[in-house]
Amino acid sequence: MKYLAVAGRQPLISLAEIQALYDKHAKLVGKNLIIFHLENQKPEINRLGGAMKLGELFEGDFKELVKHLNELRPEGKITVGISDFSKQRKAGFTFQKSMEIKRSLGKMGRSVRVITSKEPEIPSVTAHHNQLGEKPGCYEILVLDRELYLSLGTQNITAYTERDQVRPARDAKVGMLPPKLAQILINLCGPLPEGARILDPFCGTGVVLQEAAIMGYTPYGTDLSKRMIEYSKKNLSWLFNERNSKRFKIKPELIQKKDAILDKLAVGDATTFQWEGQIDAVAFESYLGAPMSKPPVDIKFKAEKAKCREIALGFLKNITPLIKSGTPIVMAIPAWLRETGKYARMNVLDKIQEMGYNFEKFQDLSQSDLLYFREGQIVAREIIVIRKR
């Protein structure tokens, strides 16, 4: 089956995520649209950190689509909206087609509510609040040139806000990993068996651990700071409580293992700690250095780079003998904005290869494309995806 993903603000990272998780031949078409194929399963919008919308190809025209919508929802009100992502878009096209659909369904005796937008695309916030593609009877049609895609849903901004800002233990001083980026890091590990044990050796307040649990994986974390381990335990306990375990669909078998999972969270230096048990994948944000409000001068930059490099490589050296061949490791390490306006990286790729790791290849992408940042951000995150030889 053919699918369309509407990527967020960093489409190349979203492309890598979809290639790793769903289809290694996924392609970027246009500025932020990704086409991919998947058999025997449906992609899930709430699984992807880098996609704003997701649609499944409908093999037919608008006339056939009207019949399909009528059959999908035999009774009750229908809500419909259209987003046009075509290369050549005509003014008023989405409104005109929406009205045609409303009239056609009206002739079939159906009550129809149309969601419109001043722009060719319905904003993600509007689509989410109207549950387009998520609630029975609520549809968004994604138009791409001559193809029509039926929405499978929009990124759930309400759930992200809750997982980011409502959880009980947060600490702005240590930096805050966005849940979306945590999802991306885990997904870049590729498909993993259900219940796979995912390690975050720099777990902080537990964002990667939280997102791993929501995906059905067993979270395992350590951190140098005792306070961070306490925060991770509080946040996972919050996630596993009766309300949130239902809200975020935590698997019952994980809830049953809650106490064992919390007990395994430990204080430990990632460069020396000896982790117990099987580790199926590793996903983490490494130490990013001191917070900065402007590009660092050379002396400061060199000192921060040396410290961050020592920690990241020290961890890899430590964990290499503890994991099996083929184990994926996905890490976000710092890159610093310089006065030139470009980011300077840690330059650890050759060293990582010497340690016995292969770099995952992504079609039409290079390592320089995997830089996660916001406009003007001083410390960006370079994402590195490797697998033990």
PLM features: residue spans?
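Extreme N-terminal starter segment of soluble prokaryotic enzymes
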Residues: 1-4
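Non-catalytic nucleic-acid substrate-recognition regions in nucleic-acid-modifying enzymes
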Residues: 6-9, 14-139
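Conserved beta strand-loop-helix elements of the APE1-like EEP
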Residues: 38-41, 145, 384-389
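Class I S-adenosyl-L-methionine
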Residues: 73, 91-92, 96-198, 381
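Conserved S-adenosyl-L-methionine
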Residues: 178-273, 281
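Mobile active-site "lid"/loop adjacent to the S-adenosyl-L-methionine
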Residues: 226-228, 242, 247-249, 284-314
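C-terminal catalytic and target-recognition region of SAM-dependent MTase-like enzymes
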Residues: 278, 291, 312, 328-389
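A short glycine-rich, Lys/Arg-flanked "PGG" loop and its adjoining helix->strand segment in the class I
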Residues: 309-325
